[in-house]
Amino acid sequence: MPEYRSKTSTHGRNMAGARALWRATGVMETDFGKPIIAVANSFTQFVPGHVHLHNMGQLVAREIEKAGAIAKEFNTIAIDDGIAMGHSGMLYSLPSRDLIADSIEYMVNAHCADALVCISNCDKITPGMLIAAMRLNIPTIFVSGGPMEAGKVIGVANIQPERRLDLIDAMIESADDNVSNRQVEEVEQNACPTCGSCSGMFTANSMNCLTEALGLSLPGNGSYLATHAGRKELFLEAGRMIVEITKRYYEQNDETVLPRSIATKKAFENAMTMDIAMGGSTNTILHLLAVANEAGVDFKMADIDRLSRVVPCICKTAPNNHDYYMEDVHRAGGIFAILKELDKAGKLHTDVHTIHAPTLKDAIEQWDVTNPENTRAIERFKAAPGGVRTTQAFSQNRMWKTLDLDREKGCIRDVAHAYSQDGGLAVLFGNIAERGCVVKTAGVDESILKFTGRARVFESQEDAVEGILGNQIVAGDIVIIRYEGPKGGPGMQEMLYPTSYLKSKGLGKACALLTDGRFSGGTSGLSIGHASPEAAEGGAIGLVHEGDTVEIDIPNRSIHLAISDEELAARRAEMEARGSKAWKPKNRDRYVSAALRAYGAMATSADKGAVRDVAQIER
């Protein structure tokens, strides 16, 4: 039977000093002996997805105390990728994932906490907390802040029809010379109307949905709107449940509640299957690989490639389809509706554990909104947007009269009526990316699934943006942006601005983009990222010359630099001859801080999740 970790600092004569300090935090004499639950919040006023989390930690903490445990809240950092986008701030986004994981490990282990509640929401916070959960392997529950409501705009002088929109619309239209200043202003003012993570299936919402598929959060975690009063119950339930599973582990020796017992290889395959089926962000591949690595699970790019070939796309939302947003996914039954359709098609391992049900099979049955007996599920998924600008959580209680149960033409479809039988994400291999690169196929027009073009090579995102806005790119070009990987950036910037600007120039379906960097979850189009190995690690993307021909074949999962093996070898030898200047960008003027240099020194390429190679410390 495992002992409560907290006994280390709360029991014994030699811990009198520690107990004195615990008392100073409000712990009473009768509390000693109760489990100590760490509540890792990520509130910040910098990020709309986190601006409403200020009171969430204490909401959970009070429920933990009612259930018979001690709750202690602390905070982690949270970077807004949208605000950091397009300038040097984006270099810090991915490295922050490791800082978040480390900070949680430090706090939990330093204070000997017994269990953990992770209050996350946006892009790097959820994966950072997942990495920490796998590293610590103590009872853990995730509860996120929830998605933002979709924006709405009537149109200038009421001439245009009403349309829904999001952050990406603001970025694209601001760079389109055909859009007036007044129209841009209207889009800007309406794109992000409420608190919460951006309203489409971008990285934040994708990751929060994946915590449901992994079995580490409650149903609705990824889709229940941040503004809806009903979401409060998720926080309260998380507070009660963490105490229950903590006691099951420490007092009943039930290891099935531990993160590593829940997030097995089967669970990672389920999460990736669901991600492919809903056309999630390509960043999810990066993060799932990193989380699996921390969990000691043998889950690699080859597994993702295998799944991508057999899983259809049955849910298609913004940015891939502007008919649907997260609020529509919720109305259709949320993530468990997607899981149900995948299960019916035999695409899931349903014998895995979850924190809230003995098996995933049980959970799917309990949260099936098509079963009229599941009244709790039906009521939860009727939650609707309020349509009022706000930064306050739980500020409205509007409900849909009916759910979207149309599995033929609705938001979530059955496999027979899938948006496409080919999944929403794919891994490509070839001489330009020997260890793979990734593309969100859900966002690629069918006309360019096979594409051959002329390479236009840029050694930084900044140069690429200048080239695109300077009209240097024409139809048929393939924009190559290299030395932007985890090591080469360092920090693996997102390339949302280059892809958005290609669209604003009318080239969204006429060009491709390949990079060893990554993309925002808001990216769509023929945008291929995570080229591995990256240029700074000796990857062949660093050997592409201006004007080379690159051949992309998504159906056959290939990407090829059209030169001979002999020519490629000769270019590699020429690069190596540069000595200390080899595999480094030419003429790039970029300030790199000591913190970023430290990250880059240990960073691995994207095919390994861009995790730190800690083995270097031992060498």
From Swiss-Prot:
The active site is at S520 (proton acceptor). The modification N6-carboxylysine is found at K124. Pfam families: ILV_EDD_C, ILVD_EDD_N. Gene3D superfamilies: IlvD/EDD C-terminal domain-like. Binds 1 [2Fe-2S] cluster per subunit. This cluster acts as a Lewis acid cofactor. It comes from the Bacteria. It catalyses: (2R)-2,3-dihydroxy-3-methylbutanoate = 3-methyl-2-oxobutanoate + H2O; (2R,3R)-2,3-dihydroxy-3-methylpentanoate = (S)-3-methyl-2-oxopentanoate + H2O. Its EC number is 4.2.1.9. Homodimer. Belongs to the IlvD/Edd family. This is Dihydroxy-acid dehydratase. The lineage of its organism: Bacteria, Pseudomonadati, Pseudomonadota, Betaproteobacteria, Neisseriales.
